[in-house]
Swiss-Prot record:
Alphabetical UniProt keywords: Cell membrane, Hydrolase, Membrane, Metal-binding, Metalloprotease, Protease, Transmembrane, Transmembrane helix, Zinc
Similarity-based family: Belongs to the peptidase M48B family.
EC number per UniProt: 3.4.24.-
Transmembrane segments: 14-34, 41-61, 158-178, 189-209
Residues binding Zn(2+), per UniProt: 146, 150, 215
GO-annotated cellular components: plasma membrane
UniProt protein name: Protease HtpX homolog
Organism field: Thermoplasma acidophilum (strain ATCC 25905 / DSM 1728 / JCM 9062 / NBRC 15155 / AMRC-C165)
Highest taxon of source: Archaea
NCBIfam families: PRK01265.1
Principal place of residence: membrane
The record's free-text note on cofactor binding: Binds 1 zinc ion per subunit.
Keyword check for Transmembrane helix: yes
Amino acid sequence: MSLMSIRLKLSSLLMGIAIFAIGFGIIYAILYYIGLNIGAIALLMVLLPIFIIMDIVQWLFGPYMIGAVYRTHKLQPTEPEYNMLTSIVSEVARNNNIRMPEVYIAEVDMPNAFAYGSPIAGRRIAVTRGLLRILEPDEIKAVIGHEMGHLRHRDVEMLLAIGLIPTLIFYFGYTLLFSGERGRNAGGIVLLAIIAMAASFLFRFLILAFNRMRESYADVNSALTVDGGAEKLQTALAKIVAATGRTGRYTRRRRNTPSSSVTEMLFFSNPNQSANEDYRKLLEEWKTAKVSLFADFFSDHPHPAKRIQRLEKLKMS
């Protein structure tokens, strides 16, 4: 395990703990202010199980909803990509010391890949038709190494758990605001309720930062578990962004503009294969681009230039 991998693992772990601690600290502070009355505690005891159940249901059945949205189907032996993809996924799973996930094809043109799963659906990795068209097999292997990192690190479960915190805080504040049981502290309780609802919004930025760390951690996983993974993942990322025809938003001319995540951009862009020829130029620009600390503040993925430069360091280590 590299020093960078250890640092990202510890940083995201500490941030996750901090999110839980701050979240429940806010709830405790509200309860303390209003006197830990039975009604407020009962409200919390009702809300918490409800949202935990909702999270569990989303986790268990989410893969089926994802499959419906992105028109995924399990890779069949009759498909031309079967041997190549099963060989790649099997090898990368073996390198990561985890059981081989099921391989799915998403019948969409946007170049992308994603890892998901649940105890009911099992672990899955899906690649889109668009991705298969623009990447070489060794680049696909690097992308699979990234997605395998998400499965290995249990990122889906972690994000669902952490995402519960702002939701709980919001509805706790919302219910207090309209509960009608404020007594003499009516003004203070209304203010606390509004602060709690505002805090739940600000928590989203912490969760985005947490997710960016996990994405970087998955990049490092690919670099460490796939031969030549760092270089191939760099090329794959440049090709994917170039193929969307939206490269302008990541060039130096606009480096101070907060960017959307690569995944979000892919979900909302139509592929432009003619732009693919520019990926080498784009890659070289990213290697030396000076990116603002806040360039990806509103994104759930690191700015592509940050990812490329981190992978460049791994190549040299």
